[in-house]
């Protein structure tokens, strides 16, 4: 999965994060982070490296969902590349009931308008097709259609992208009241 995201310059993995839980007990409040600097998700020893982080005081602990962190590339209206940490996030769950994966986006470059509601067609055109292509390739790889996540204040998944916002006088909603920073 990460190879597809890398191919589209959406996620260059540099770390993995996960929590530990124990069946019948729940979350243990123990969080791990493993740097991939100098390593790779393709490393055959990686699963053992993750398991070796099991807390000593909890030999029955199991890993929860694994968050793949890193930077991705987005393009501005003039075509200039920008690297952005956590442009997209990939969460994979090794659950024995059935593995799952979730791809999340947290940037306005995927939508037709920025967070202030200003249309940005050149930015959308430079970025949204890459996300769409990656999602379609992930569906092919996994052999299962993606299920859209819950709608948020910032948008709603539609097909292999984001639903177009409602516009008034050609402007989308101003969402900056909820933007941190």
Describe each PLM feature range.
Residues 96-181:
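Acidic, proline/glycine-rich low-complexity IDRs
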Residues 1-118, 124, 128, 149-152:
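Structured alpha/beta or helical-core interaction and ligand-binding surfaces enriched in interleaved
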